[in-house]
Amino acid sequence: MAEQAQPFVHLRVHSAYSLLEGALPIGKLAKLAVGYNFPAIGLTDTNNLFGALEFSEKLWSEGVQPIVGCSLDVDFGDQRDAQSPMVRTLANSPRAHSAGRLALYAMNADGYANLMRLSKAMYFDPAADEPTHTKIARIEECSGGLIALTGGPDGPISLALHGDHTALAAARCDRLANLFGDRLYVELQRHGIDKERRVESALIDLAGKFSAGIAAGLRIIDHQLRHQKRQIEG
């Protein structure tokens, strides 16, 4: 008897509400999820929850479980201490206050309320001349009911590893592990690009060192859900 395939769930979908990034209307996303028999979908639009209500309503109406999340630019307050070209470039970029993007998901009503608080803080906390971001200290105040993924190649741990700052990567992973405990997952992404391959083994080692789970993610910004599913299944 053939072994039944495990259900597949995309956790890193970006809709058209990911401004200047996503191109997938939520109504279309719901129809695709039904057509491809996905039991659930995770939405992680960048720095906002603009589509959370529409996403929840439309997916529930189609019998698909909505997983509400957000990708947040997070300032750990440590990136300017490092002197690699990656960090110096980051310090001079529009994302100067971002040490990388974390993906946070609401696991209950408290988590959703905290996501709302963080979404609001993204726009009210920075100075007028600063890009949209939040500080890790703010997340520490609002971590209840949230599950965290470390963000793939644009996450704070991977960015430190890209700059050969292994101690910085470990310190960030340690901080997140202390904050989220068993709700932290080190995210591995495989889009077939070198910067993912270079750090994958180090990410796996960090997950083991800090007793974090491991999650597979693919950043979906358009309609190619099925194509990416096949890539994972090999």
What are these regions (language model features)?
Residues 1-234:
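Phosphodiester-processing cores and adjacent nucleic acid-binding clamps
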